Amino acid sequence: MSKTHLTEQKFSDFALHPKVVEALEKKGFHNCTPIQALALPLTLAGRDVAGQAQTGTGKTMAFLTSTFHYLLSHPAIADRKVNQPRALIMAPTRELAVQIHADAEPLAEATGLKLGLAYGGDGYDKQLKVLESGVDILIGTTGRLIDYAKQNHINLGAIQVVVLDEADRMYDLGFIKDIRWLFRRMPPANQRLNMLFSATLSYRVRELAFEQMNNAEYIEVEPEQKTGHRIKEELFYPSNEEKMRLLQTLIEEEWPDRAIIFANTKHRCEEIWGHLAADGHRVGLLTGDVAQKKRLRILDEFTRGDLDILVATDVAARGLHIPAVTHVFNYDLPDDCEDYVHRIGRTGRAGASGHSISLACEEYALNLPAIETYIGHSIPVSKYNPDALMTDLPKPLRLTRPRTGNGPRRTGTPRNRRRSG
């Protein structure tokens, strides 16, 4: 398989339902990515799939295309009731569920299949109103799905297609019992099409596939390299005292069009936000306690380009489909080596190049050996001149409600470069 972003395989080459092909081509999707080219022949033949591919390689469109085709090509279960969806797509986070729903809308519009969305933290009655009118494809997080199921707002007895997206993250967040609860209320595995996708598929995820799927075919793209080959990786060793100034200096000299900065704690994210906002950057903050409506607004502003920088905990590392992220900064090296892969996977997506810069400080440098062992290579080290770090920095802002703040639009040119030669 070629390592280019797209293969020579076209969606129109497959025996897909004409309405699905029409919807894909209307959105500009003509050629398959490698994971799509591997998955579609299997799902079109009714085979279950457990797929591993790096983020940004088209996993979402692979399972959406398969789901819509299957439902259009197979009749609904006899005597199906209005509260019985035909397909269930489970995601680990609210943001990912919302994005999958958005990606599915063009296909729903073209095919007439109805979508439903179920996630916690917001919109209970609004979501329920849609479900009560009847949906074909239900996309959601496990907690809200179980809530609706226990109250009989939904019944899973007519499910024909099941998708688990970011399955390893489901384990990380402790949702495996919820997943099994939902599976027990569906028809047997051999009476439905089952798909599981993730950037990493650990032994425990393969065990789940064996348990809940029907002889799933395991497929993977570029297994020998866990980090995208279009992502330039770079590592610095700052002292704790120089770490913030190094970050701000790097931002000034890189001048990223769109960057995500990851830190390991909510407090650290707020600290970074305060420094960057005070320095005039258009920066948003995304941590676990930000209200759902505000989270979606921040992501929308970042996607539109109204924000240049997003500071986030790992709540934003998995599954977010934000286009054209040019830089990822690991202000803290993550404690979980898999999170390193998912963090830097926010850049270098859809065939574009990207740049990942990590700071191995005194506190988190101990995480580096496990990360490099996991990704299978050493991260190239760059040096900096401590005397050239920025010093003309304003006092950081203190976070007050609302939790996001936009500095003025960045104008002019970056400050002079400050790296050592």
Curated annotation (Swiss-Prot):
A motif (DEAD box) lies at residues 165-168. DEAD-box RNA helicase involved in RNA degradation. Has RNA-dependent ATPase activity and unwinds double-stranded RNA. It comes from the Bacteria. One of its GO terms (biological process) is RNA catabolic process. Residues 245-390 form the Helicase C-terminal domain. Belongs to the DEAD box helicase family. RhlB subfamily. Its EC number is 3.6.4.13. GO terms for molecular function: ATP binding; ATP hydrolysis activity; RNA binding; RNA helicase activity. Residues 392-421 are annotated as: Disordered. Residues 40-219 form the Helicase ATP-binding domain. The keyword RNA-binding applies. This is ATP-dependent RNA helicase RhlB. Component of the RNA degradosome, which is a multiprotein complex involved in RNA processing and mRNA degradation. InterPro entries: DEAD/DEAH_box_helicase_dom, DEAD_box_RNA_helicase, Helicase_ATP-bd, Helicase_C-like, P-loop_NTPase, RNA-helicase_DEAD-box_CS, RNA_helicase_ATP-dep_RhlB, RNA_helicase_DEAD_Q_motif. SMART domains: DEXDc, HELICc. A motif (Q motif) lies at residues 9-37. One of its GO terms (cellular component) is cytosol. It is found in: Cytoplasm. Keywords: ATP-binding, Cytoplasm, Helicase, Hydrolase, Nucleotide-binding, RNA-binding. HAMAP family: DEAD_helicase_RhlB. ATP binds at residues 53-60. It catalyses: ATP + H2O = ADP + phosphate + H(+).
